[in-house]
Regions:
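Conserved beta-strand hairpin/beta-sheet module of binuclear metal-dependent hydrolase folds
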Residues: 3-66, 153-156, 160-164, 268
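Active-site neighborhood of phospho(di)ester-bond hydrolases with catalytic His/Asp-centered motifs
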Residues: 49-51, 73-81, 101-105, 162-165, ...
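Short acidic active-site motifs
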Residues: 88, 296-301
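Terminal amphipathic helices with adjacent charged low-complexity linkers/tails
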Residues: 226-255
Length: 402
């Protein structure tokens, strides 16, 4: 991707990475991604907004040079300091001797540890601060937890362009700059939703705050950090509406209490059945279904768990631990919004029975309200033990009303 123009004085100089399939270890990126970066030229000064991943330094530098000499850059603005935004910074600053680096207060702390260069020429950009490039003003808007504590937005009122950082972005790569040229809009929408869920899903209240700030501006163009540039009359309004819809507080119509489990020989599954029976005896209107983790898509189960009012999770003990699919599901727990969510842990074991206490410890570490110390049976549960499981489910349901 070579440099392209957003407006007469704003240019996209970012990088396409269509081959990326995993981002930040855990995010699948079926449609690749882009590392968006922009140059804003005023009559007197030039600003570079965001940089890119270190892997692409040479190509990125060539894109910058298509627009300006790096030595003529006065400001390097990082709306967010994650390495996909700041990766080339340490090398780039050597070519930009007059450039001041503008970041948020939190960003100034992160950047020193990301670059290991404590002498970088960093200036903290506070909420409401601005720089004048000569006919072009860049105003800074604090946007913490969208999606890091350091995040901010940069607004150019003269051009009605918002540099939105990761907000309204997507891990999606087509060889076009604008949303008006997308060849596969359905795939983009899929990537947009997946990106929101993974990046912003844990922060709905902050998303609402950010939308309030964005809606107060007369935005015609959103230059985000990943995916196509969004324009008024095409995808911009749609994207804002989706964020608004997805981040609004939602209450389940009936109590949602899913029970997730894995079972080697069906014994943990039998316990799950009885726990469900006990829960429904106390809360008959609850949506309490049982899900064999190996039989369902992990993303579906993740969404269900994170929407739940309470949940159960069960595992046999194999090799002195819970089994891998159960740990995999818990690795997708929204650790921020899961705090104080009631959880019930159960399982059958043959020898030592570590699965239940290990899962209990993990959920307590996530600040879940784990019910008692869980429920365990040895090998095949007897009828008496199954009745105890049902009573355990009833007591768990009763605890939800307290």
């Amino acid at each position: 991707m070579s440099a392209s123009s957003i407006t007469k004085d704003i240019h996209a100089v970012g990088i396409l990475n269509p081959a990326m399939r995993i981002f930040d270890v855990v995010m699948k990126t079926e449609y690749g991604t882009s590392y968006n970066s922009y140059i804003v030229k005023g009559a007197e000064k030039t600003a570079l907004i965001e940089t890119c991943h270190l892997t692409f330094f040479d190509q990125y530098l060539d894109n910058i040079r298509q627009v300006c000499d790096p030595a003529q850059i006065h400001y390097i603005i990082l709306n967010h300091c994650e390495p996909d935004h700041s990766g080339v910074l340490a090398r780039l600053t050597a070519l930009c001797p007059k450039a001041q680096i503008l970041v948020s207060q939190a960003g100034s702390l992160y950047l020193k540890n990301i670059t290991n260069q404590p002498s970088l020429p960093i200036t903290v950009a506070k909420d409401g601060d601005q720089v004048d490039l000569g006919g072009k003003t860049l105003q800074f808007i604090s946007a913490p937890f969208l999606h890091w504590p350091d995040s901010m937005l940069t607004w150019c009122p003269e051009e009605k362009v918002l540099f939105s950082c990761d907000v309204l972005g997507a891990h999606y790569c087509e060889p076009y700059t604008f949303d008006t040229n997308m060849a596969y809009p359905a795939k983009y929408e899929e990537a947009f939703k997946g990106y929101y869920d993974a990046i912003f899903g844990p922060f709905p209240s902050y998303v609402q705050n950010g939308l309030t700030q964005i809606k107060a501006l007369d935005v015609e163009t959103v230059c985000n950090s990943h995916g196509p540039v969004l324009t008024r009359g095409c995808r911009l309004e749609w994207a804002i509406d989706r964020y608004d819809e997805w981040s609004r507080p939602q209450k389940n119509e009936v109590p949602l209490i899913p029970i997730f489990y894995c079972s080697a020989y069906g014994n943990t599954g039998r316990v799950a059945d009885m726990l469900r029976a006990g829960i429904l005896e106390e809360i008959p209107h609850a949506d309490c279904q049982i899900y064999d983790i190996n039989a369902h898509d992990i993303n579906f189960l993740q969404g269900l768990l994170n929407r739940s009012d309470a949940f159960g999770i069960g595992s046999p003990t194999i090799n002195a631990d819970a089994v891998a699919p159960v740990w995999n599901l818990l690795s997708h727990v929204d650790a921020i919004n899961n705090r104080k969510r009631p959880a019930l842990v159960f399982g059958s074991y043959g020898w030592s029975g570590e699965a239940v206490p290990n899962l209990t410890a993990r959920l307590k570490g996530l600040k879940s309200n784990v019910f008692e110390e869980g429920f365990r049976t040895i090998f095949v549960p007897s009828e008496e033990e199954l009745q105890k499981a049902k009573e355990f489910g009833k007591r768990f349901a009763q605890s939800l009303a307290k």
